[in-house]
Amino acid sequence: MPTLLQINITANWGSHGKIAEGIGKIALSNGWRSIIAYGRWYNPSQSELYQIGSIRDEQIHGVTSRIMDNHGLMSRGATRRLIDYIETVNPDIIHLHNIHGYYLNYPILFDYLAKTGKPIVWTLHDCWAYTGHCAHYMFARCDKWKTLCQHCPQRDTYPKSILLDRSKRNYLLKKHYFCSVPNLTLIAVSQWLQNDVKQSFLKDLPLYHIHNGIDTNTFYIDRDTDGLYTKYNIPHDKRIVLGVASNWFRKGFEDFIQLRHMLDDEYTIVLVGLTDKMLKQLPTGVIGIKRTQNVADMRKLYSIADVYMNLTWEDNFPTTNLEALACGTPVITYDSGGSSESLTEQIGKVIDQGDISAALDSIRLYSHNPVPEELCRQHIVDNFNSEQKFHEYFKLYCSLLSHHK
């Protein structure tokens, strides 16, 4: 029985954790053993779970990162115990997801991975692997990662460092360790990310592209929405413009406020994922909803919206676009990262970052010339079903193992 071990900051929690869970289910259905090693935050899983480190370890890692810019360089004991566990379960494939997040020591881990001889897969969900500090550089319009990170302009962003800038050292450490594993295969979850990886120090590693997908049995066109209007005080007689983010940092909150001042009274903007502070800042005509894990409510919100707006300034491949389309709602997005890759001209509009006038024109276009709901949904069913994507990973595992023997 082959064994798959995945490593991620979460287990069956959040988008990346659910991707690992879905891949694990496919492995199990094919007679494999599936294990997920995680740092923190989990939901019950069909895979076996192994927790890396402790809350105290995470706190120490976080504090030293804030002061010394040591992100990924602490958690030595936790990482060595993980390696002992890996030796015990002896996996055939090791699949990395997000290894940042104050829970792993990447030099210790990659020094071990370089010696195992096992096939290693690493899905890049952001840009952290090839920068000296940040997970995203689009907003800062920084391209130092192409040559050598130093004098970081984003030291105050995740993983925040308030005292030292060690971006040059971090860049060189990552380059050394991440390029030292002979059997490492990279996966980029967007074509945009794949193109940037090809310009980084990771360019010589095997690199594939697998888009993220969604569960189209969970996100569909929902007609049973009457109770939703009452629950969130959404007016029945308004056109709905929807925006969703789990974290609104650089996701266009201010742009939505500006848009509200330009929109006619026939529209109501609904924003999901807001903090208490943001809720207090909302003008008339904007309904705010806190972050919710209620998938049924999210499905209904997508379904009642006339248009889904993704005014993100920094993104890789947002699955909210997929969720909206699966629920029959056209998407308008800024041209940020891979955000446009799930759209076609028939079901979405791509506009320049910050172009609120173009956003306004696109909203009016879709409001008065609705896109057929089934056209939006069928595009996602055909191209971005999560089951399809998980099977692509499993096919890759089998290919790597066949060449490894």
Where are these regions (language model features)?
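Conserved donor-binding/catalytic core segment of Leloir-type glycosyltransferases
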Residues: I187, P235-K251, I257-R260
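Conserved acidic donor-binding segment of nucleotide-sugar-dependent glycosyltransferases
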Residues: E345-D355, R364-P370
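Short acidic/histidine- and often glycine-rich active-site loop of Leloir-type glycosyltransferases
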Residues: K280, D335-V350
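A short, well-ordered alpha-helix in the C-terminal region of glycosyltransferases
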Residues: P370-K395
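Short hydrophobic beta-strand element within catalytic cores of glycosyltransferases
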Residues: P330-T333
